[in-house]
Amino acid sequence: MKKGLTELCYGFFSTLANPTRLAIIEHLNEGPMSVTELVEALGQEQSMISHNLRPLTRCKLVKRKREGKNNVYYLNHETINPILTAVENHAEKYCEGGENCPLKKGAM
């Protein structure tokens, strides 16, 4: 393992290890959205959505573009898609669809 990789991995996975951020990623996987659309979709305060978008955009997992007066957020599919595929493949192979899978919410 390269020196410093542990720190990089920790920072990367810490950015993802948040239910609100994962929900944002899940919604953006359907297509680009504004903060207002994310607020409506997730039922959370605008400040909470903005707070959680910040680390995702800083790490370039989510990208932002200006459309008129609004910022629209979209996934960096080049990075996110392989991660989501790896998680799905791992769960299919090792969780056998069971409710006792430690990867499922509440099982840890």
What annotation goes with each model-predicted range?
Residues G4-S47, E67-I80:
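N-terminal helix-turn-helix DNA-binding core of bacterial DNA-binding proteins
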